[in-house]
Structures are given as C-alpha cells and as structure tokens.
C-alpha cells in the first residue's frame, strides 16, 4: 500500500485536519507535506474514532451533520426554529482521535471492543502497518525523510531508490544503469524479506496491463483538447484514484478504454458532461486540495471557467516494457525533468488544449508539484 494514496483517501474523507494536528502534536512541523503528516500520525497508531457515551455505549451524534429531512412529497421539513430539520439517517457522530497501539494493550473486554469498533469504518483507517517501506525520490524529496520516519517508528526495513535530477532533456545511459542497479538490488532485498522469487513473466504481464491502462488514460486526458471539452478536468481528478492505485490491473484498462470510447461518442455528438456553458478554458497547475474540490469548482462554474488542461494527471501515463525502460521512465516524472523540458511540457499542453489562462495552486509544502523548480 502506497502511504501517499492512503493519506489522500483520508484527506478526501475529510479526516486530514485531525490527523495533521495529531502529527503536529507529535512534533512534526505544519510546513511538512499534509500527506506525510497524515501518514506519520497513522504510523504512530493515531486513528480517527467516533465519539460515544461510555455509560450508554451509544455514539454521540453531531447535530451539525446530515442532510435536510424531507417529507413523502419531497418537501424539506422545517423545525420550530424555522430551520430545516436534519434527516437522522444521514447524521454522523462527533469525531475524535484514539490510538490503536494503546487500545491493543488493553485487556480483552467491553472497553477494548467498543474502542476498536469506534475507529472510523473507512478503509483507509483499517490498513495494517507495513512490513517494509520502499521509497523513491523522483517525485518528492520530503518522501525520503517521511519514509525514514515510518521505518523508524515501525522498526521495519527501508529500501531506497535514488533518482538523480535530470539536468538534460535526454536521459543518458549511465543514469539508466545507475537506477537499474538499484532496482536489481531492491529485487534481491524484497526476495529476502518476502521469501518469494521475482517472477519475470508476472512482471511482464504487469507492465502489459499498466501500459494498456496508461495509453487509455492518456487518450482520456487528450479529449480535453476539444472545444467545448466533453468533460471537466475535475473529472480527471476523480478518476486519478484508479490510475494511481490500479494501473497494473486488467480492470483499470477495461475501465479507461470504456471511458475513452464514451468520450469519443460525446465529442462526435458535440455534447459535454460539464454542467455549465464553457466560456473560458484554463490549465490547472499543482496538486488538487482533495477535501476542498467543491469549494474550487463552484466559483469556476459560476464564471464559466472549465479546467481543460492538467499537469498532474498525465504524469501517470508512463509506458515501459522492461526494467531498463522503467528506469528511464522514472527520470521523466514532472519533478525530475530539467526546467527546459518542464516549460516545454506546459507550453505544449496550453497550446494543444487551447487554454485562455493558467490557474496555479501554490502548495507551500510541495513547491515542485506547483510548477516551481529552483
């Protein structure tokens, strides 16, 4: 499990702020990447838990949550205070933080059972701790210290793949050999840790699946070039979860090929799924703020601004057929390329996708992913 994916899932479920605060309470600065803070808190045993009354055992409902209650005719039911009543079925308990490591030390009994049950049921809060961490620094330097801390906290091995910054457009063979040697060593380390031998045929099949998914994904991204765009760049943000976590599966390839086919039909009909008239087109630079996507989408919608170019999304469309090609591809992550190539990529996507301007999200903890190099 990639800790960054887990952290993004926790953030998207709006638990990120609680987990970040827990990490800061552990001594981690709030200038550190939000993904890292969430992940480090999780490694320390912190879990988001539903608050309950110890006397009754019932969860304490947060009255601010829930959707408006509607009658049989679909009308909103108003309360005596003149405000809409809340549908009890949609209300959720107050949230608090608990520590799984402390819970596991408790003797078996009702308290232990209830505290375990109270931990948030979202899947990202139920993931077991890793047996080892495998780190690569081609997209993020913070990740090096982040994974080192996870390894220290969990007392587990750390396998490191170092990808030097590529200061030329071309990737030289010497650089590929350097990374390939690290992959070969990592394979041996993983064989020792897991007791399993590296299966070349399975790797080739995984590459074939990943390539199929990547090609379909890039085709989906390219449909944003049409005017009007058949969909919004915000849809790409939603689909990214699948291309990041399931790229090497047959199901992901099936899904994105089907999506590409559907978008092709939408373009032929001159239609769009964007729920507003497209007056302006912009490129989005930077990492989306996952729990606040609606807050960004709504004002853009109000002014007819559609995101029709994204730097972040196509970065997951790499194609390679063997370990050498994979090593070369690692040098082509947006944060690993030289400034000339980075500018050229952005100029090309702005031109091809016919944008009127650029919207830049300057993420203070992740400047390279905000288009800032140096």
What are these regions (language model features)?
Residues 337, 341-374:
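C-terminal hydrophobic structural anchor segments
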Residues 1-55, 89-92, 96-98, 118-125, ...:
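An N-terminal, globular interaction/scaffold subdomain
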Residues 52, 123-223:
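Internal, well-ordered alpha/beta segment that forms a basic, Gly-enriched binding/recognition surface
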Residues 39-41, 107-113, 136-137, 333-339:
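Short, flexible loop segments at the rims of nucleotide/cofactor-binding pockets, characterized by
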Residues 180, 184-313, 318, 335:
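A charged, amphipathic alpha-helical module
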Residues 2-26, 283-347, 351:
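Redox- and metal-dependent alpha/beta enzyme cores, enriched for Fe-S-associated oxidoreductases
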Residues 135-139, 284-289, 362-363:
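Structural motif
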Residues 52, 56-118:
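Long intrinsically disordered, low-complexity regions that are acidic and Ser/Thr-rich
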């Amino acid at each position: 499990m990639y800790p960054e994916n887990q952290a993004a899932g926790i953030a998207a479920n709006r638990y990120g702020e609680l987990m970040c605060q827990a990490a800061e309470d552990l001594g981690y600065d709030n200038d550190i990447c939000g993904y890292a803070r969430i992940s480090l808190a999780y490694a320390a045993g912190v879990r988001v838990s539903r608050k309950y009354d110890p006397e009754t055992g019932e969860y304490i409902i947060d009255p601010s949550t829930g959707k408006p209650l509607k009658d049989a005719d679909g009308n909103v039911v108003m309360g005596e205070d003149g405000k809409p009543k809340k549908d009890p079925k949609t209300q959720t308990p107050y949230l608090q933080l608990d520590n799984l490591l402390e819970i596991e030390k408790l003797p078996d009994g009702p308290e232990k059972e209830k505290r375990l049950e109270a931990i948030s049921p979202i899947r990202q809060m139920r993931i077991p701790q890793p047996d080892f961490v495998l780190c690569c620094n081609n997209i993020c330097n913070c990740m090096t210290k982040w994974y080192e801390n996870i390894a220290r906290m969990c007392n587990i091995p750390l396998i490191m793949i170092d990808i030097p910054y590529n200061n030329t457009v071309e990737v030289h063979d010497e650089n590929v050999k350097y990374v390939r040697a690290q992959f070969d060593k990592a394979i041996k380390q993983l064989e020792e840790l897991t007791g399993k031998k590296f299966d070349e045929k399975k790797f080739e099949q995984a590459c074939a699946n990943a390539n199929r998914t990547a090609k379909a994904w890039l085709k989906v991204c390219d449909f944003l070039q049409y005017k009007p765009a058949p969909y919004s760049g915000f849809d790409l943000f939603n689909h990214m979860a699948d291309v990041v976590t399931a790229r090497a599966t047959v199901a992901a390839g099936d899904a994105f090929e089907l999506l590409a086919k559907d978008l092709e039909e939408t373009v032929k009909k001159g239609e769009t799924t964007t729920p507003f008239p497209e007056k302006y087109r912009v490129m989005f630079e930077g990492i989306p703020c996952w729990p606040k996507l609606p807050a960004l989408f709504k004002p853009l919608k109000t002014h007819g601004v559609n995101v029709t170019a994204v730097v972040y999304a196509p970065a997951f469309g790499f194609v390679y057929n063997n370990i050498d090609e994979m090593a070369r591809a690692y040098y082509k992550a947006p944060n690993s390329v030289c400034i000339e190539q980075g500018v050229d990529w952005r100029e090309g996507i702005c031109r091809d996708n016919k944008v009127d301007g650029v919207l830049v999200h300057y993420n203070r903890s992740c400047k390279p992913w905000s288009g800032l190099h140096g």
